[in-house]
Design a protein with these regions (language model features):
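Metallo-beta-lactamase
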Residues: 25-27, 32, 129-204
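Conserved beta-strand hairpin/beta-sheet module of binuclear metal-dependent hydrolase folds
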Residues: 31-80, 214-226
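Active-site metal-binding loops of divalent metal-dependent hydrolases
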Residues: 43-44, 67-68, 97, 119, ...
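Active-site metal-binding motif and surrounding structural segment of the metallo-beta-lactamase
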Residues: 60-61, 71-116, 256-258
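Active-site-proximal loop/helix segments of hydrolase catalytic cores
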Residues: 199-256
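C-terminal regulatory/interaction regions
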Residues: 291-334
Length: 334
């Protein structure tokens, strides 16, 4: 029997080697991280998953971490999980409330319990109604803009432009069938889920990517499914974030010697160096903001600066000005 109970501590884990991604579909590829543990990595070439997910064989039950943005992509995730584990999906974890991680919930019920923090469930109820109403009125314009951007993209820009077109196509395709499916189990602080073979620890990370994010730890395997607390080779988005709190939380995960593999919400599976890289990114932006405030530079000028050379190759460059605005606002308050 699966037992769920609150807990606070991490356990010691051992190092697990990386596995190469297995052949996947238009929407995602599957990468085995350890026995019974897989990452489902979004396919950037026009796929509709948009974010990464996880599949865990608990032994007698199957757990999925994050549910993708598009219900059809989520249906494929569900089939893949059940083929790999030979058990139906019993638990789906929502790492946070953003659409690209929760709109696949509907394909897992009935049958699975959807789990999130209390704050995430409440925010999902409010935000999804507002966002879906806006999308139904505006998705046509957004989709056409994405097509135009792809047509005008340079050779270096084209690959990412294909990904963004897939994002808007996935939204457009899903809107007629979308049913907001809220979590039925919520928790605060932390939650263990124990299976006959493997256990996972859900940790609430407050004021990181959003006001409440979930990171899932497999202590014995040394694996962390980070949700959008971690982006790899992509600019994070600080629109809902507290950059300083996020940085401190990332430093905690970096300092945990038991953790060796990190699955980001966006980007490839990575080791600890990716965590430190994102910490450095936040430090760099904070330093730029501090200097701008000291020089009384207007925020409208500050946010127009170019991406630093070391981050030029990262995707999601459209988030950079938003991130500058966020750290500038924080620096002004000091």
């Amino acid at each position: 029997m699966i037992k769920l109970y609150l807990a606070t501590a991490l356990s010691v884990a051992f190092m697990i080697g990386f596995r190469k991604p297995q052949t996947g579909s238009k929407n995602f590829s599957v990468q085995q991280l350890a026995p019974g543990v897989w990452a489902a990595i979004q396919n950037d070439k026009g796929g509709h998953a948009i974010s990464n997910a996880g599949i865990i064989d608990l032994g007698n039950k199957t757990l999925v971490f994050d549910a993708f943005m598009n219900p059809d992509a989520a249906s494929e995730l569900k089939r893949t999980a059940e083929q790999l584990t030979k058990h139906p999906v019993s638990f789906v974890i929502n790492s946070h409330y953003h659409d690209d991680h929760i709109r696949g919930n509907q394909v897992f019920v009935p049958g699975a319990s959807i789990i999130s923090t209390e704050w995430t469930k409440n925010e999902m109820r409010k935000a999804e109604a507002e966002e879906q109403e806006w999308l139904r009125k505006n998705i046509g314009k957004s989709l056409e803009k994405a097509k135009q951007q792809l047509r005008s993209a340079t050779a270096n820009e084209k690959e990412e432009a294909v990904m963004w077109l897939g994002y808007y196509e996935g939204i457009s395709q899903s809107l007629p069938i979308l049913k907001t499916t809220l979590p039925d189990i919520t928790f605060k602080d932390s939650l263990w889920i124990h299976g006959s073979k493997r256990s996972v620890l859900l940790i609430e990370c407050k004021n990181c990517h959003t006001a409440s994010d979930v990171v899932m730890i497999l202590p014995q395997q040394g694996i962390a499914f980070m949700g959008d607390v971690l982006f790899v080779k992509r600019h994070p988005w600080f629109g809902d974030s507290n950059a300083e709190s996020l940085k401190e939380r990332l430093e905690d995960f970096y300092a945990d010697a038991s953790l060796t593999q990190f699955v980001p919400g966006h980007g490839p599976v990575a080791g600890k160096e990716a965590v430190q890289t994102l910490v450095s990114y936040i430090n760099d932006l904070q330093q730029l903001a501090t200097e701008a405030v000291q020089k009384n530079e207007a925020d409208s000028d500050f946010i127009r600066q170019d991406v630093p050379a070391q981050y030029k190759s990262w995707w999601f460059g459209r988030f950079y000005s938003d991130n500058l605005a966020a750290v500038y606002h924080d620096a002004k308050k000091k």
